[in-house]
Amino acid sequence: MPEGPEIRRAADKLVEAVVGKTLTRVWFAFPELKPYEAELVGQQVRQIATRGKALLTYFSNDRVLYSHNQLYGVWRVVNAGESPETKRDLRVRLETQNRAILLYSASDIEMLTPEALTTHPFLQRIGPDVLDLSLTPEQVYERLLLPRFRRRQFSGLLLDQAFLAGLGNYLRVEILWQAQLAPQHTAAQLNEEQLQTLSQALLEIPRLSYNTRGTVDENHHHGAIFSFKVFHRDGESCERCGGIIERTMLSSRPFYWCPHCQR
């Protein structure tokens, strides 16, 4: 599944293609969305934003298209009138005079009003977005120590979107390496210095991944172009201590770490 940085980079491309432009053609695959096709033609795309791994497309008539890529969804930008050859199922087409954005394979798609947006179950459940620049390490520190999070092992907590939105497996792996923490630890077990280091890493690593423009293709959403320290490097030497990086399964996901310096 693509993580927060990949979703935000995809959104950046969509923004460049259609925001501020008038829609000339709208098509939805799902019957419940069909009534909105005619309504949206002639409207402008005002904004495209992300909340964790969800993408929100705002229109000038105050409708908001909610979509979540889940495992297989992917957005593409094409020229107006273009229909790429693909085995994927097209779900959404939003076209302007010159460009079109296409959503393939996703199944979690809804049209919302501003009021419904504030009560949407997924958006209500998720925590602060790690790519929101107003989120500070001090706020993350406080969140780590909340009663519902402070005794949960990091192996599961860092995958829980209710804790911080936008984190995923490669970020979990790299954050814990950066903080020199083993995955079985909890916030309640850490000292002040460890909590501060982890709080910094929880924001620095996702933002580094986003800012260094990771590469994404249809089948591999994990390839950010910054130096992975442990992710997919099992059997190699840890650059920090020289120990051997290991791979295991935690919370049903592959986990990479250096047992020698992550304690």
Curated annotation (Swiss-Prot):
UniProt-listed Gene3D superfamilies: 1.10.8.50, MutM-like, N-terminal
Q: Does the keyword DNA-binding apply?
A: yes
Please give the start and end residues of each transmembrane region.
none
Give me the reactions it catalyses: 2'-deoxyribonucleotide-(2'-deoxyribose 5'-phosphate)-2'-deoxyribonucleotide-DNA = a 3'-end 2'-deoxyribonucleotide-(2,3-dehydro-2,3-deoxyribose 5'-phosphate)-DNA + a 5'-end 5'-phospho-2'-deoxyribonucleoside-DNA + H(+)
User: Per its UniProt entry, which superkingdom is the organism in?
Assistant: Bacteria
Q: Which residues bind DNA?
A: 70, 125, 169
Q: Which residues form the active site?
A: 2-3, 53, 253
Zinc fingers typed FPG-type, residue spans: 229-263
**What does the record give as cofactor?**
Zn(2+)
Q: How is the cofactor bound?
A: Binds 1 zinc ion per subunit.
Please list the GO biological process terms of this entry: base-excision repair
Entry keyword set:
DNA damage, DNA repair, DNA-binding, Glycosidase, Hydrolase, Lyase, Metal-binding, Multifunctional enzyme, Zinc, Zinc-finger
Q: Which GO terms describe its molecular function?
A: class I DNA-(apurinic or apyrimidinic site) endonuclease activity; damaged DNA binding; oxidized pyrimidine nucleobase lesion DNA N-glycosylase activity; zinc ion binding
Which family is it part of? Belongs to the FPG family.
Q: What is this protein called?
A: Endonuclease 8
Instruction: State the species of origin.
Output: Pectobacterium carotovorum subsp. carotovorum (strain PC1)
Q: What is the lineage of its organism?
A: Bacteria, Pseudomonadati, Pseudomonadota, Gammaproteobacteria, Enterobacterales
Please name the gene that encodes this protein: nei
